[in-house]
Amino acid sequence: MLGKEDGANSIGKSSAMLAIDFVFGGDTYLKSDGVKHIRHHTIFFAFQFCGQKYCFARATEDADNAFLCKENHDLMGPYRMKDEFVNWLKVQYHMDFDGLSFRIALSSFFRIYSKDNTDERRPLRGIPRKDMEKSIALLVALFDRNKDIQV
């Protein structure tokens, strides 16, 4: 998502990206302007895997859970604990790599203004305040190349 180069239009790009991160199990959105201004709310979203659509809801006031719902947004339960939901996503996206959590793999490369990982001089540094070695190890694991490295 890109805005104008001069940054003149603040159209909520960061809030939208934080909401997307929230859908994937992140929590930074809970402290965002979106929640501060419109208070607690529920985000409804869907994923499609192998031709099957899965609809969910995640509420800011109950962020530890993700609820299964119908396409019309009716909650149908059962709910999943956030960690269980994130693990389900990891399996669906085939991202079960040694030494790499799904959340770290995903959120490390979301470049969102308020997430403190927007260092344009070090674009491979996916983990703020960590050395480049950890960021490179993350990329190696993300591309499932650990087995190719000889020690």
Where are these regions (language model features)?
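Short, well-structured alpha-helical interface segments that form or flank functional binding sites
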Residues: 11-19, 38-42, 134
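Gly/Lys-enriched N-terminal cap/neck module of very large, oligomeric protein machines
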Residues: 45-46, 52-68
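Extended, charged alpha-helical "arm/stalk" segments used for dimerization and assembly
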Residues: 61-64, 69-150
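A general structural signal for short secondary-structure junctions and capping/turn motifs
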Residues: 35-37, 46-48, 58-59, 128-133
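Flexible phosphate/Mg2+-sensing switch loops adjacent to catalytic phosphate-binding sites
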Residues: 28-43
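Phosphate-binding glycine-rich loops of NTP-binding sites
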Residues: 1-31
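A generic structural motif
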Residues: 5, 52, 146-147
